Amino acid sequence: MAQLTLEIRRPLGVLLTRRGQVQEVIVGTELTLSSTTMTLFRTGTRSLRGLRFVRTQLHDQPLSQEALTDLAFLRLDLIGILAVEEDGRIGNLYLAHLLPPGSTGQLFKVLKAIPFHNLTISFDTFIEELEADLQCARALHAVGNGKESAILVSASAKSRAEQEEQLVELAELATSAGVTVIGRMAQRTTDGHQRYLLGSGKMKDVLIQTLHRGADMVIFDQTLSPAQLRAILEMTDIKVIDRTQLILDIFARRAHSREGKVQVELAQLRYLLPRLSGRGTQLSRLGGGIGTRGPGETKLETDRRRVRDRITHLERELAQFARHQDQRRARRNRYGLPVVSLVGYTNAGKSTLLNVLTKSHVSAQNRLFETLDTTSRRLRFPEDREIIITDTVGFIRDLPQELVGAFKTTLDELREADLLLHIVDMNARDIEVQLTAVESILEELQLSSVPRWLLFNKCDQVPSQQVEVLCRRFGAIGISALEPTTLRPLFVRLEAYVRSLSVEDDRTSHVTVQDYELTFSSRR
């Protein structure tokens, strides 16, 4: 190696396996592993890749920062630099290896330079002990209950405060998907980097921190284009998903009805189809765990034609659901029952309000996107006036277009509403952001013309003076779905609204909703 280095006047490096076999020969200072090597020597659950890199250089200089970055980024067993003298003799050897996560916060250790011929290290024993230490440290930092862990990343032109706020929401989404968040990173950029969203250097830093902290994946708050996702996966074998994929995974968990499952699978396939091209073995990194619940790896690793065929089949099935929905809607219209739909940001308390108003028992856990399938219940007022209360999927900022398209039949229920009740979580950190996000989605769905009332929920968690100020400012009604006495003003206003519609109730009809009665006496 020393002789060849002198002849070509360029550094020469070799990647060696633990058996001492040469895996790759690299000319120059840039260390990039081929896709074949990346595939054969994945880190997976191991702490190290099983490769060490030794390179010559024409000057007696210590390890560069670039070399140390490569060590951490590629999870090499060891990296060594051999100084080649002008007469062809080998001078000092510079070595470095990774360190377990600890109080020092250091990623690697640079050993003291020694003459090459004085090297006495037993590499097999050294690597075995090092990997044992790394595995032990990883076990200490591991997340319990078999949950996956993630580093969250935001890269946008928004202020640091806005990004941090959005990362809080992303963390809530991750928690809803069963992921434990162990770190967050925010990078302000004037424009998203075309290749990696972040610059290549910053992207390496993110991946190094992910590896060092033992995280299973990186979750981006921004949607990654197919080209960006492909470029990132060419750099690493860490699982990488974006916010859209995370939301799709949550929807896959929450879908219970056949219609809901079809809509989620359709959204997932539409999202993944443009990301299938040219991925080869990297596609398998989408398999299993968060970001892939629903269609499954086997289905996605078929050819694009079969995926398109599946999409076509799901679209036909949804069209059938839509026809059935139209028939139900027509029957309901014949009975003349007004429809009031609950809309709002996810986890604002819509299902809880539905349960209290109609004495129902739909799931209303305190987590994002708890409700996915549409639920309709009958609310009966005194004097035998009735309305249908409908609870639908919650909204979120930057709602993925794949979901908007796939859930068209569900969202079409809102078009038939006589009145929308926009539920807002009064205790939310970013109440105005959530309110604006929902209003924007309603406008996108062309629902601006439907009458709607603003309800500020969870007023029991906010000082009464603040409730009064906010309700006056936005023209809202303050309620707490958990405090029935606060619902009296809403109930009175709803009854007056129904009376104004002059709807005559036909109590002999057989509407396909459950029948519950709510009177003033039950609220006293």
Task: Show where each model-derived region lies.
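Conserved G1/Walker A P-loop phosphate-binding module
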Residues: 1-103, 290-401, 411-415
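Conserved C-terminal guanine-recognition region of P-loop GTPase G domains, centered on the G4
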Residues: 67-70, 87, 162-180, 205-212, ...
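C-terminal-of-GTPase-core extension/linker across diverse P-loop GTPases
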Residues: 1-8, 16, 84-86, 90-151, ...
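Conserved phosphate-handling catalytic cores of large alpha/beta enzymes
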Residues: 249-268
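Flexible beta-alpha connector loops of hexameric P-loop NTPases
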Residues: 157-162, 191-196, 254-260, 299, ...
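Conserved nucleotide-binding/hydrolysis micro-motifs of P-loop NTPases
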Residues: 21, 85-89, 156-160, 189-191, ...
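N-terminal accessory targeting/assembly segments
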Residues: 1-243
